Amino acid sequence: MTHTRRTFVSAVTVGAVGLSGCIGDGDDPPEDEPDDDEPDEYDFEDQPEDASPTFESPEDGATVQSPVEFVVSVEEADLIPAGENEVGAGHLHILVDHDVFDRGETIPGPSDSAEEDGIYHWSDAQTEDSLELEPGEYTIAVQLGDGAHIAFGETDEITITVEE
């Protein structure tokens, strides 16, 4: 190869290598545009205050047998599994003979000790489930919590009597 040809090939090779470093593969979004794959940042303060769970069954004052089947509807919020945080969404907690939690308070559990204290988590975004309760009178509340079990929205409360 002649000296001129070698110089030309070297110059073309160096130029091609340098140019390839300037061209992206198209997978990365431009720096000034948001990546659509990244979720929006979650801010608890944006959770709706008017989100409202309501007992559909049993009715307030009902006499029932164990296991007690609870059915709940929810307005102004969506239900999503525990562990996921999304504004306008959460999961339900059933409180048996337990005070409701103030907005922003962490609802304990899920754990055996929380259930011993009357706090039951419906962590799978369900709207119905059953509980084994001994005979007696109970005050039952339902409350929304976000993915980290932080209480928000309104609550509903019923009183039931469980018979043998």
Residue ranges, per PLM feature:
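Terminal disorder- and signal-encoded targeting elements
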Residues: M1-A89, H98-E164
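Conserved aromatic beta-strand anchor motif in extracellular beta-sandwich/beta-rich domains
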Residues: I94-V96
